[in-house]
Amino acid sequence: MAKKVAAQIKLQLPAGKATPAPPVGPALGQHGVNIMEFCKRFNAETADKAGMILPVVITVYEDKSFTFIIKTPPASFLLKKAAGIESGSSEPKRKIVGKVTRKQIEEIAKIKMPDLNANDLEAAMRIIEGTARSMGIEVVD
């Protein structure tokens, strides 16, 4: 018999640095999950990806046990890293804050492929290019 799902929690956490402080503590605490156990397991699994922000989907079951799936870093995070900028443009399409090459877009698309709703690399690249444009990052050849 499969366990009954009580809740699904989505968080974006720095790799290897989950702590019981907000936002982790309150999000998991209200569902009765052992917060320290989650933090230890998450940090152990993401220790090799230091410096990245990773989305995680935590499934909490009725018996207070949990499982979690770690997704690929957000496209915006990868684009900011590739362009070497702190944050996106305050006025996208008017104010360009950085540049990325097609090669960098392809690399990001390859990393994001498992989480994107795209059939091939071309479609994935177009999705990432759109994200770049909406952040005020210019795509150059």
UniProtKB/Swiss-Prot annotation:
A Pfam family per the record = Ribosomal_L11
Q: Please indicate which superkingdom the organism of origin belongs to.
A: Bacteria
The record describes its post-translational modification as: One or more lysine residues are methylated.
This protein's record includes keyword rRNA-binding: yes
A biological-process GO annotation: translation
Question: What GO cellular component term, any one, is given?
Answer: cytosolic large ribosomal subunit
* Ranges that cross the membrane: none
Which molecular-function annotations from GO does this UniProt entry contain? Answer: large ribosomal subunit rRNA binding; structural constituent of ribosome
Q: Which UniProt keywords apply?
A: Methylation, Ribonucleoprotein, Ribosomal protein, RNA-binding, rRNA-binding
Q: How does it assemble?
A: Part of the ribosomal stalk of the 50S ribosomal subunit. Interacts with L10 and the large rRNA to form the base of the stalk. L10 forms an elongated spine to which L12 dimers bind in a sequential fashion forming a multimeric L10(L12)X complex.
The record's family statement is: Belongs to the universal ribosomal protein uL11 family.
Q: Which PANTHER family match?
A: 60S RIBOSOMAL PROTEIN L12, LARGE RIBOSOMAL SUBUNIT PROTEIN UL11M
Q: What does this protein do?
A: Forms part of the ribosomal stalk which helps the ribosome interact with GTP-bound translation factors.
Q: What is this protein called?
A: Large ribosomal subunit protein uL11
Species source reads: Thermotoga neapolitana (strain ATCC 49049 / DSM 4359 / NBRC 107923 / NS-E)
Where is the organism placed in the taxonomic lineage, from the top?
Answer: Bacteria, Thermotogati, Thermotogota, Thermotogae, Thermotogales
